[in-house]
Amino acid sequence: GPGSSLYGTNAFFAVINVITRLGRNFRGVETSAGAGSFETYKGRVSYGEKFQSGLEMVFSGSYYGSDGDDHLFFKEFDKPENNNGIASGLDEDRFENIFAGLLYRDLSFQVNYHKREKDVPTAPYDTVFNKLFSTDDERGWADLKYERIIGDQFNLMARFNYNFYHYSDDYFPNEYHGTVKTSDDVDSQWLQGEVQLTKTLLEAHKCTF
């Protein structure tokens, strides 16, 4: 994609170009829904608009939930003390995502929040099989960007964003026979900023600082 002009075409430095839909790309409210096996449901509601003032806004919220397979068999745990290798009711998955964006002339602001809760039936990290191992991931960010074309050959872009990530899990360590679960919690927050100046050279080449 276009990012290869900055990072090269080497497959080890792959660049994914995500182009967010603008308010003008919507026709009011959009909705979608779906259902599947294992009590699986998902849905999305989106709204976008461009006003006469030039302000554009976008909002989108989505949800996914699944009870998963109630009886998953793992031959590696096929012993009587491990419920004969069957993990019962440990495949639940839930996530929700919220996105909002504003655009006015050369200035844009976007926020995003994502959360996922997942039960893991495979007894990872030497935990007790057929006991609850659940994970909780949260990720969010807010991004403010200013982008302007200067003259015929220069493009200025400046942005600043705030990010956070949270992870937690609950589990029973292996060879533990109590009723109190062990928990892990990880929190991270960071700020980022960048300024880019791009100049077109010889009509078809770009130089970025």
Where are these regions (language model features)?
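N-terminal periplasmic accessory domains that precede
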Residues: 6, 10-34, 41-47
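Face-selective signature of the C-terminal outer-membrane beta-barrel domain
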Residues: 101-117, 136-209
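Periplasmic-side early beta-strands and strand-to-turn transitions of outer-membrane beta-barrels
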Residues: 5, 25-26, 34, 46-135
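Hydrophobic core residues within well-ordered beta-strands of beta-rich domains
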Residues: 12, 27, 41-43, 55, ...
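Periplasmic plug
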Residues: 1
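Preference for bulky hydrophobic residues occupying beta-strand positions
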Residues: 18, 31-33, 61, 144, ...
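Short, glycine/charged-enriched secondary-structure capping and boundary segments
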Residues: 11-14, 73-75, 124, 173
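Residues that define the transmembrane beta-barrel architecture of outer-membrane proteins
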Residues: 12, 34, 39-41, 94-96, ...
